Amino acid sequence: MNKEEILKYVGFDLDKAKQIYAWLHADCEQAPTPSLPNEVVSIVEQDGKKLVRVDVGNKYHFGIDLHDAPNEMNWDDAKKYAEDKGMRLFTLEEGLLMFCFKDEINAKLKEAGGDELREDDYYWSSTEYSRTNARLVHFINGTATINLKSYGYVVRPVAAFTCVS
């Protein structure tokens, strides 16, 4: 999938997003003031933690941890690792958006003192496929695949954002 196909897959309407973007962030002090589509990624602090924030349209707002987990882990351990940090695994759609904006995300991760997303590994998503399988995202080409939850893969937690006026 290319960037446009992924944005369409996750239901992102660029024209509509441009129209509602100002409204979306009107009451959110932390929100960046980008002009879509090029500046949807920013560095923010939430709960004393520096994150790379991604804002796409009116549906996807999340912060990416600056670092991967120290080791690859199975899906259950990956979920627990993220939860112990007060975060979660990204959804499949969020992972695909991370692929779409990986250059911008990696630049901000580096600027914030974090580690770039690896292109040579698969990352766990929170999206389950079955009782024994979950979805993964590969950041070199945006591949979304399925594998056993018992296998070890890379983990990059994310946090949800809410605007408080």
Language model features by range: what are they?
Residues 3-87, 121, 133, 154-158:
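Extracellular adhesion/carbohydrate-recognition regions
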Residues 1-2, 165:
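The identity of the second residue at the extreme N-terminus of proteins
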Residues 75-88, 92-151, 158-161, 165:
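An exposed tryptophan-centered "aromatic clamp" motif
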